[in-house]
């Protein structure tokens, strides 16, 4: 996923179907400089992680 699209998803009021390693996730924020995103699996906000944007897939 590119940086611009990830940022659009973060700012969108709608829930967008995005996965990381096949698991549905929520994007909290995007680090444009490092091309990473702070995410957590849906329903598991305690499992935050920083991942490369290239590993996120929009469905």
UniProtKB/Swiss-Prot annotation:
UniProt record similarity statement: Belongs to the SspH family.
Taxon lineage: Bacteria, Bacillati, Bacillota, Bacilli, Bacillales
A Pfam cross-reference name: SspH
Entry's Gene Ontology BP terms: asexual sporulation; sporulation resulting in formation of a cellular spore
InterPro entries (alphabetical): SASP_SspH (IPR012610)
Major location (coarse): other
Domain of life: Bacteria
Subcellular location: Spore core
Protein name as it appears in the record: Small, acid-soluble spore protein H
UniProt keywords, alphabetically: Sporulation
The keyword Repressor appears for this protein: no
NCBIfam families assigned to the protein according to its UniProt record, in alphabetical order: PRK03174.1, SASP_H
One GO cellular component, as annotated: endospore-forming forespore
Induction note: Expressed only in the forespore compartment of sporulating cells.
